[in-house]
Amino acid sequence: MLYTSMAHPFTHLALSALGLLAFLQASYAQDPLDRIPPDGQPWRIERPADVPPALAAALKQADCRQSEAMMVTFPIELFRPAGARPMAIVPCSGITLYGRAYVFERDGSLRALAFPVMPFPGRVNASEQAGVLAWNPDAKTLTALESNDVCEGTVTRHTYRYDERHGGDDLNGFALVKVERGKLGCNGASENWQVMWEN
């Protein structure tokens, strides 16, 4: 009888502990930014179902569409440059493929980034659609490749370098360092890039 009366409090305590553990795990899993590695390496998202809700809402508002097939080749990347807010680079389908970048603000909202682009030497504009974006965590560079729907058409590649001293600025620490132009061949990329501007 003593064993039975003692078993009930222990069972109740064990079930309470398991419930608390499940609650803590669920709370931890609810914040998708916790999945972003702290060392600049990207978290690649290859399925629309895995896109964090706040980002999915921002993409819908911007009419930035992805498909399952496109995301296998061009995944969404979430990364955290050292000393900066987490950010996302996203491919979008349209007449040509283009990209958008967002910074996750402290309150959980997203802010679209407008990058400096140089359509002509010496002329700088800001654009939220600088091109298809790629992050290199080792070099701490973000490249934007302007796509083209014409075979053998001229394309532009902008390179932005991350500087943690400017992690909280308008571009989340990125500055334009190089602009190149080249022609993409009908069968893929050519190695004919010419530097148009470099800082």
Explain the meaning of each model-derived region.
Residues Q25-A29:
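Sec/Tat signal peptide C-region and signal peptidase I cleavage site
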Residues A14-F23:
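Bacterial N-terminal signal peptides
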Residues D31-V51, A58, A62-D63, L133-N199:
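Acidic, small-residue rich beta-repeat scaffolds with periodic aromatic anchors
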Residues M6-H8, S67, I95, T154, ...:
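General secretory precursor processing signal
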Residues T96-R100, S127-Q129, E152-R157:
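Short, surface-exposed coil-to-beta transition loops
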Residues Q30-A101, E105-N125, Q194-N199:
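Flexible low-complexity loop/turn motifs enriched in small/helix-breaking residues
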Residues L2-L15:
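Bacterial N-terminal signal peptides that target proteins for export
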Residues R111-S147:
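An exposed acidic His-Trp-rich patch
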